[in-house]
Design a protein with these regions (language model features):
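Conserved anion-binding
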Residues: 35, 39-119, 123-128, 135, ...
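Glycine-rich beta-strand-to-loop/alpha-helix junction loops that act as flexible
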Residues: 5-7, 141, 171-174
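Conserved alpha/beta-domain cores
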Residues: 1-20, 31, 37-40, 124, ...
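Short glycine-rich, acidic/polar surface loops and turns
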Residues: 126-130, 151-160
């Protein structure tokens, strides 16, 4: 179990201070860095003092950017983010991509492998194809217990994700929205069926 913090938390009034006080915890900084190589490197240098265990970067930043980021990351595991789980083929076409989402994810997984990234983030729906070209950790967001998918599109249940080969599951709102204790029990019940 680890703690995942996004840009909104890190940039909040007390976010950085809170993260700096966490000791002996797995810290996953989900910043989804997406910029030119120099800015990606500068961003990683700017948060080195937080000693995060995992840090995300968009593979769409390009090979030079992710390779430079990996070089400067040190002990921090650099995680390549593929296509966001809130996007499907229609949404990708709207922003100028003509390839199928699975083809894009597969191409990005190959690039992550070439840059020697430590892990990759992709939808649980793509894990099986990603495993063919990327042999390290695979982290899957968009995990849902039921049909309430919020703004996620490419979703699966925890059991389906593990069956497909996911190493780590990111489960946010299904746990944090509403009664957390009850939601955790729902997760436990789901996994024990």
């Amino acid at each position: 179990v680890g703690y995942k913090f996004g840009l909104e938390f890190l940039n909040s009034k007390n976010g950085r201070n809170f993260i700096s006080k966490l000791k002996k915890k797995i810290i996953f900084a989900d910043l989804k860095i997406n910029d030119i190589p120099n800015t990606c490197v500068s961003t990683i240098k700017a948060i080195k003092d937080l000693k995060v265990n995992y840090l995300t970067i968009h593979i769409s930043s390009g090979f030079k950017a992710i390779k430079a980021a990996k070089k400067i990351a040190g002990k921090t595991k650099l995680i390549g983010v593929t296509v966001l789980t809130s996007l499907d083929n229609k949404a990708l076409k709207e922003i100028g991509f003509n390839k199928d989402v699975k083809k894009i994810v597969l191409d990005q997984a190959r690039l992550a492998n070439k840059a020697k990234l430590d892990a990759i983030v992709c939808s649980a729906q793509e894990v099986k194809i990603v495993k063919k070209v990327f042999k390290k950790e695979i982290i899957t967001p968009g995990i849902r217990f039921n049909s309430k998918i919020n703004d996620q599109i490419r979703t699966l249940t925890p059991k389906q994700a593990y069956k497909n080969g996911s190493d780590w599951l990111v489960i946010g709102r299904p746990i944090t929205k509403g009664n957390i204790k009850k939601n955790m029990q729902t997760l436990i019940d789901h996994l024990s069926q």
